[in-house]
Structure formats: C-alpha cells, structure tokens
C-alpha cells in the first residue's frame, strides 16, 4: 500500500518536520508513505472572494497533477465526516479490500480546498470544528494513519 499526503505549503518548523519524520519511519513497516509539498499562492491582505477563488483554483491545479487516476482520495475539510480512530482504521482496511492500493490525503492551504478537489475526493474527512494550522494538521494526520495501522495490529499503542 502507498499513502500520499499531498499538502499545500512548505513546512518550516523543525519540530513538526521531526515529528512527521518519526511517524514516516514508524509507518515504513506497513506502507510506503510519501509527503508531497506543493507551493502555496500568496494571498493578499483583504483579498476579494474572487481573488480567493482564483488562488484556490491555482492550488487545485497543482494538487490534481499529483493525484493518480486510481487513488482513493481523502480530502480534509471542516465540513467532512468525523471518524473515531477505530472507524478510521476500519476505513483504511476497507479501502484496500475494495481494490485501491494508493490512498491520497489532501490538505489544502490557508484558504482551504477548491470545490473541484472536494468533488474529486472519495471522502471528505474532518478532524472536528477546530481550526488548526495546516502544517500542524500534517502531524496530526500522519499520527492517526500510524494509529490506524496499530489498531489493525491489535497493538496496545491505541488506548
């Protein structure tokens, strides 16, 4: 299985990079986990709604180039479905049973995701109504992916 985290924006904070690298290392015994960073567009102060839409559309074009035609796409969006860790673990195992070998998670930039990416997604997923920096969300997501595999293994990691 191959898991891709497609993220808009560069990760600058060393402590987040270190945490993500640790979970990538842990995940290597279960799957190949690639993190793909895409350039984000600069958003001018007081950008109009039209300008924001244009920015999200440009970012969406970059995202689409990284999505495989047969990827199972999970886009993170505040309006998405909230799952308990056990449900998330079950979802990941079900995806492979359905014949998908690649799962792509998409984390948008500061403005969120363009509707075209949400439409392409097989699932919109939310980690709750809290607003988190998209850089921090990467660490939260990769930890939950690792937790999902540990749940499948019956490991005491998940308590």
From Swiss-Prot:
InterPro entries: Alpha/beta_knot_MTases (IPR029028), RlmH-like (IPR003742), tRNA_m1G_MTases_N (IPR029026). It holds the Pfam family SPOUT_MTase. The keyword Transmembrane does not apply. It is found in: Cytoplasm. S-adenosyl-L-methionine binds at residues 76, 108, 127-132. CDD domains: RlmH-like (cd18081). GO terms for cellular component: cytoplasm. Keywords: Cytoplasm, Methyltransferase, rRNA processing, S-adenosyl-L-methionine, Transferase. It catalyses: pseudouridine(1915) in 23S rRNA + S-adenosyl-L-methionine = N(3)-methylpseudouridine(1915) in 23S rRNA + S-adenosyl-L-homocysteine + H(+). Its main location: cytoplasm. One of its GO terms (molecular function) is rRNA (pseudouridine-N3-)-methyltransferase activity. Its EC number is 2.1.1.177. Homodimer. Specifically methylates the pseudouridine at position 1915 (m3Psi1915) in 23S rRNA. HAMAP family: 23SrRNA_methyltr_H. Belongs to the RNA methyltransferase RlmH family. This is Ribosomal RNA large subunit methyltransferase H. The lineage of its organism: Bacteria, Bacillati, Bacillota, Bacilli, Lactobacillales.
């Amino acid at each position: 299985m191959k898991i891709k985290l497609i993220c808009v924006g560069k990760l600058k904070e060393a402590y987040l990079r270190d945490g993500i690298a640790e979970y990538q290392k842990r995940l290597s015994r279960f799957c190949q986990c690639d993190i793909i960073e895409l350039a984000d567009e600069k958003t001018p102060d007081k950008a109009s709604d039209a300008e924001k839409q244009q920015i999200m559309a440009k970012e969406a074009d970059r995202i689409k180039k990284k999505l495989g035609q047969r990827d199972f796409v999970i886009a993170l969006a505040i309006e998405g479905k909230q799952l308990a860790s056990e449900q998330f673990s079950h979802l990941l195992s079900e995806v492979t049973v359905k014949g998908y070998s690649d799962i792509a998670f998409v984390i948008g930039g500061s403005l969120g995701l363009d509707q075209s990416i949400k439409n392409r997604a097989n699932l919109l997923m939310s980690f709750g109504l809290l607003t988190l920096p998209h850089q921090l969300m990467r660490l939260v997501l990769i930890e939950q992916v690792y937790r999902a595999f540990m749940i499948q293994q019956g490991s005491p990691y998940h308590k």
